[in-house]
């Protein structure tokens, strides 16, 4: 991982981080079957929403170039990972692991033994990433209306029930 630094977000990171957030949101949309080009405006709004809510935003950078980010919400001492993303060029180089370690440090600093994660059920990359760190899917079913343009093409069995997905 060489000269990669993990630090808290600074104001001058805004545009670079917003561009990464736009890519992140586009990739998450694809998991729901929604194809959208990354929108810098959407990324800026998402990042601003995190900042306005006083979420912790960590960035990974090397030679002043942003490689990725992680966003955490702390609720009653419990740390929730809201987002973690690395640019495609920075993947499989330990950048996301370094970001996640910083998030785990935040949780431990709050006296919590774990970070809570909200993961889309077919985000295999994230599920595998977390599994390597000892995290397991325990419980959680998202109940909401389908997004506009979202195609629910699968069924997921949970116990005696079957849910649209």
Language-model features and meaning:
Residues 3-19:
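A short beta-loop-alpha structural element at the N-terminal edge
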Residues 59, 65-73, 80-85:
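Conserved beta-strand in the GNAT
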Residues 117-126, 148:
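Conserved beta-strand-loop-alpha-helix junction that forms the acyl-donor binding cleft
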Residues 107-119:
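Conserved GNAT acetyl-CoA-binding A-motif
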Residues 45-59, 80:
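A short helix-loop-beta-strand connector motif used in the catalytic cores of GNAT acetyltransferases and
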Residues 86, 92-105, 128, 132:
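Conserved acetyl-CoA-binding loop-helix of GNAT-fold acetyltransferases
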Residues 11, 25-46:
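Conserved GNAT-fold acetyl-CoA-binding loop/helix
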Residues 132, 136, 141-165:
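Terminal substrate-recognition subdomain of acyl/acetyltransferases
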């Amino acid at each position: 991982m060489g000269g990669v630094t993990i630090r808290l977000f600074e104001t001058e990171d805004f545009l670079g981080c917003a561009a990464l957030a736009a890519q992140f949101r586009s990739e998450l949309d694809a998991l729901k079957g929604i194809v959208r080009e990354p929108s810098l405006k959407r990324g800026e709004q998402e990042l601003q929403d995190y900042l306005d809510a006083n979420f912790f935003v960590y960035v990974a950078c090397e030679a002043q170039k942003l490689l990725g980010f992680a966003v955490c919400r702390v609720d009653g001492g419990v740390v929730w990972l809201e987002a973690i993303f690395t640019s495609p060029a920075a993947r499989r180089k330990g950048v996301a692991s370094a970001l996640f370690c910083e998030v785990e440090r935040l949780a431990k600093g709050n006296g919590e033994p774990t970070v809570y994660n909200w993961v889309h059920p077919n985000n295999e990359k994230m599920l595998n990433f977390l599994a390597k760190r000892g995290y397991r899917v325990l419980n959680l079913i998202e109940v909401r209306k389908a997004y506009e343009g979202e195609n629910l093409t699968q069924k997921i069995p949970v116990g005696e029930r079957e849910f649209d997905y």
